[in-house]
Structures are given as structure tokens and as C-alpha cells.
Amino acid sequence: MAKLLSCVLGPRLYKIYRERDSERAPASVPETPTAVTAPHSSSWDTYYQPRALEKHADSILALASVFWSISYYSSPFAFFYLYRKGYLSLSKVVPFSHYAGTLLLLLAGVACLRGIGRWTNPQYRQFITILEATHRNQSSENKRQLANYNFDFRSWPVDFHWEEPSSRKESRGGPSRRGVALLRPEPLHRGTADTLLNRVKKLPCQITSYLVAHTLGRRMLYPGSVYLLQKALMPVLLQGQARLVEECNGRRAKLLACDGNEIDTMFVDRRGTAQPQGQKLVICCEGNAGFYEVGCISTPLEAGYSVLGWNHPGFAGSTGVPFPQNEANAMDVVVQFAIHRLGFQPQDIIIYAWSIGGFTATWAAMSYPDVSAVILDASFDDLVPLALKVMPDSWRGLVTRTVRQHLNLNNAEQLCRYLGPVLLIRRTKDEIITTTVPEDIMSNRGNDLLLKLLQHRYPRVMAEEGLQVVRQWLEASSQLEEASIYSRWEVEEDWCLSVLRSYQAEHGPDFPWSVGEDMSADGRRQLALFLARKHLHNFEATHCTPLPAQNFQMPWHL
């Protein structure tokens, strides 16, 4: 009876992975209640085959879930319509509640029938036995056997806790349950006395900004968190997970962040290969509709690196909602997991981000300054210009206030706090992070990210002459035109390197540098072009084109 109840309340099972011979438990290991035997690919098909009763019951419950999601998103309009028609009176609401209660009882009955279907299936019974054994005893053997299954991630046991590193428990300066530290925007009206009257005047605007950010704004910024989109992508995500586990020997893990969100991660270890880059770990930060199952993780994988992918809060197996604070909390526990559980030193970690993932990547670089390098692909400097691009001009004040208070993705500000090597990849046909049209390459916000970084690190070089010549170089529409500008100013790379190395040897590596202070205008132009070319590479593609492995290069450093 207990097993039947477990089948009724248990998670949905999607797939049974093929188990490699090298990973199977030795035959001499005795079978115990906490060490059950996982299925081999020779005995069962790798796709879980539900019985007819479970299959049809699952379809009914999935359909009900979709209808509930549609009702949730359309509830404001439905409420307004029912109110106008007078259907919200007590005489109408009471019968409706009876109908709703009857429907819930029917769905509960369907769930029980699904449980009976699972109970009659030996595949599911063996899975639920392994799952229960792992929750009782998280031994390495139980975890290894549980990893052979792909199921609803909410039931996966937590593998790593944000407080697990001993240094976190002893230090008061680490993150609290309120979250890690973020750079906060300055007040919009500096110098104004923050009296009670001013607070009352601002209250309607603050409430409006909050409602916009938590309804339309967050879903526009992170469409991957919308349940209906995830439901449509589920088959693709399952295929991507199967590829990572079966072909790349990936290991899935659940991390608990300081805000209570559970973060879904996938680790592919290449340290045992002959490739030297396998000793380096690339932590991948996906875009606003990207998942590690099908996202930018494929680029460093193809290049031979060890890779750690993770999903934003609210994406696929990760819980929560993707606001900046939650994003930073998630990135923090991912980096801690890489250092304290996977055993990588910060000097062996590379942060790689695509598009909106640049926020968490730059936060990690700012918060963990010893990481080896940062690579930002198709990213931007600040969210406000891109948000203003897609909203009516009359909403400018509301949009700016909402972004600054609730959705402040200040990539450039965070990146300038990092002292290590940086590479920016600009897509020359990008249709997402341009503020006008894709053909207008100067409206690509990657340009502004580069300029802000160089102006912070080399303010004397990026004075008037240097800034002007870098803008000309950024405006070049082809590699031939870029080379023409570079050769026009007769950039001597050996001279530039010697100047920079001499300055570093004398003054140290900390930015900003005053190099170029006593230099001629032509010298500053040469240095500015040299530095721009070293920090930014062009990729002739649109925003969502996968980056080829040959374009995944380590950033330049002295």
C-alpha cells in the first residue's frame, strides 16, 4: 500500500538513460534497501514506456495544467469581463465554486488512476524505489543509480547547499538569506529631501513600476520562464539532456541558493582527457530564452573544455523567478559548487555568457575577481536603451524607472569592477541588441560595452583622439574596412605591447591605468585601436546563431 501511495504522489518519469558499462556497479555489490539495482540498457528501452492507464491519465493532467496556465495569464481580462457582465455576484460565484470543486475531485481521481498505472509498471516501481532510497541515504551509489533516470526535477534531492563551504559558515561577510550583494542604482533625483510627503508622491509610480516589472516586464525580459513556452520546448529539452548525459557523460545536480531557489545544473568533466583545455572549466550563462540543454554550452563542449551549465531561476528544472537578485544568487551558488564540490580553482574557471547571460557573468567576474577570464557573446552594456527601443516613447519615464528599480541589468558597471582578461564577441547582423535596425552596426550595444570598459581601464588612451578612432573602427562594415582603418594609422603591435608591458611592470596590473598621459595623439590612436582589436572580435551572424567552436577563443592578456 505504501508503494502504491508513492506511485500516486511520485514525480513523472520521462526517460531511462543508457548506462555505460564502465559506470555499472560491480557484480559483487550486494543488493540492499539503500543500494538497489538500476536498469541496464540491454533489458529495457531507454525511453520510459508508460502503461495505457498512466499514459492517458498523464495526458488529461497535462491538458488541465495547460488550461490552468492559460487561465492564469488571462485572469485579469477574464475578471474584467465577468465584472462587466455581472457574473461576480454571490449567486453566480457559489455554483461556480461547486463546479470547480467537482473538477478538482475528478482530477484527483485521475491522479489516483495514474498512480495505479505506475504501480503496475515494473520500470516505475524500480525508479520510485531508487528515488526513496536516495532521499533516505544520499550515498554515491544511490546517486549514481538515480542519475540513470530523467524525471520531474522537483523531486531530485539537493546535491549542494549554498552554506556548504566552511568559509561561508565562519564568515559574516558572505551572502545571507536576503541575497548576495548587487550594485544599486543611484537615486533618480539626487539632493531631494526624502520626506514623508515625497514618499507619498512617489508611491503611485513605485506601485506601477512594481506591477509592470512583476507581470509584463519580467516575462518580456525572460520569456524562457513562461510555462507554456517550456511546455512546448519539453521534447527538445529532454533530447538535449539525453545527449549531454549519454554522449558527453554529463552529471546533473541540484543546487540550493541562499534565497531558497533550486538551480538545475549539468556538469561535463573533461579533466581525464588528453586535451589540455579540459583542465579549464567554462561556466555558461544562457540567454533570456536559453536552456543549458540546447544553449551556448555546446560551443565550449565542442572546443574540448570542461563545462558547467545552469538554468535561470524559473527555467526548466530551476525554481523561482528570474529577477536580478535571484539571478545573482543562483550564479553565486553555481560558482561555489564549481570551486568547493567540483574542485576547480578560480584561476581555472572561465565565465562564458550569451546575450542577457552577460549580467550574471559580469556579476561573477566582479564578485570572484580571481576567475581566469570572461567571454561575452552578443551582450550589452545596459538594459535601459534596449527596453526603450521596444516600448512606446510616451512610456520612457515609466520604463526607465521600472528597469532601474526592478530589472537593472548593469553589465558594463559590473564588468568594470573586474581586472582580468575580457573578450567581447559582436554579432554584425544582431537584430536584438541593436537600438535601430540590424544593419546599423553602430547601434549595437556591444559597442557601448567595449567603450565603457576601455574608458575605465585606459582613460588617458581613450581620450578624444582614441575614442574617435575606435568609433571609426567599430563603424567598419567588413573585415577589409577594419583592416584599412588599422593600417591607415600604422598600428605597430610590438610597440603597443612594449608600452603596455613597461607600464604594467612599473605600476602593477590594477586598473585604471594612466598610460598614454604623456603620449602623442598618434600614439594614443595606435594604442586605442590595438586595445579595441584585442578586446572585441566580430562574428558575422544574427543574434541566435550558435557560435562555432573555432570562434571560442581565450581573451588577450599581457
UniProtKB/Swiss-Prot annotation:
Q: What class of enzyme is it?
A: hydrolase
Please provide the Gene Ontology terms (biological process) for this protein: monoacylglycerol catabolic process; phosphatidylserine catabolic process
Q: Its domain of life?
A: Eukaryota
| Residue intervals passing through the bilayer | 60-80, 93-113
GO molecular function terms noted in the UniProt entry: monoacylglycerol lipase activity; phospholipase activity
User: By its UniProt entry, which Pfam families does this protein fall under?
Assistant: ABHD16_N (PF22990), Abhydrolase_1 (PF00561)
Annotated Gene Ontology cellular components are: endomembrane system; membrane
First-listed, main subcellular location of the protein, grouped into a coarse class: membrane
**Annotated compartments:** Membrane
Q: Give the annotated active site.
A: 355, 430, 507
Looking up Gene3D superfamilies in the UniProt record yields:
alpha/beta hydrolase
Could you tell me the EC number(s) of this protein? Answer: 3.1.-.-, 3.1.1.23
Topological type in the membrane: Multi-pass membrane protein
**Per the record, what ranges lie on the membrane's Cytoplasmic side?**
114-558
Report domain AB hydrolase-1 positions.
281-407
| Catalytically driven reaction(s) | 1-heptadecanoyl-2-(5Z,8Z,11Z,14Z-eicosatetraenoyl)-sn-glycero-3-phosphoserine + H2O = 1-heptadecanoyl-sn-glycero-3-phosphoserine + (5Z,8Z,11Z,14Z)-eicosatetraenoate + H(+); 1-hexadecanoyl-2-(9Z-octadecenoyl)-sn-glycero-3-phospho-L-serine + H2O = 1-hexadecanoyl-sn-glycero-3-phospho-L-serine + (9Z)-octadecenoate + H(+); 1-octadecanoyl-2-(9Z,12Z-octadecadienoyl)-sn-glycero-3-phosphoserine + H2O = 1-octadecanoyl-sn-glycero-3-phosphoserine + (9Z,12Z)-octadecadienoate + H(+); 1-heptadecanoyl-2-(5Z,8Z,11Z,14Z-eicosatetraenoyl)-sn-glycero-3-phosphocholine + H2O = 1-heptadecanoyl-sn-glycero-3-phosphocholine + (5Z,8Z,11Z,14Z)-eicosatetraenoate + H(+)
The UniProt entry, under InterPro entries, shows: AB_hydrolase_1, AB_hydrolase_fold, ABHD16_N
- Print the keywords alphabetically: Hydrolase, Lipid metabolism, Membrane, Transmembrane, Transmembrane helix
User: So what family is this one in?
Assistant: Belongs to the AB hydrolase superfamily. ABHD16 family.
Question: Which PANTHER family does the UniProt record give?
Answer: ALPHA/BETA HYDROLASE DOMAIN-CONTAINING PROTEIN, PHOSPHATIDYLSERINE LIPASE ABHD16A
Describe the function of this protein: Phosphatidylserine (PS) lipase that mediates the hydrolysis of phosphatidylserine to generate lysophosphatidylserine (LPS). LPS constitutes a class of signaling lipids that regulates immunological and neurological processes. Has no activity towards diacylglycerol, triacylglycerol or lysophosphatidylserine lipase. Also has monoacylglycerol lipase activity, with preference for 1-(9Z,12Z-octadecadienoyl)-glycerol (1-LG) and 2-glyceryl-15-deoxy-Delta(12,14)-prostaglandin J2 (15d-PGJ(2)-G).
Q: What is this protein called?
A: Phosphatidylserine lipase ABHD16A
Species of the source: Macaca fascicularis (Crab-eating macaque)
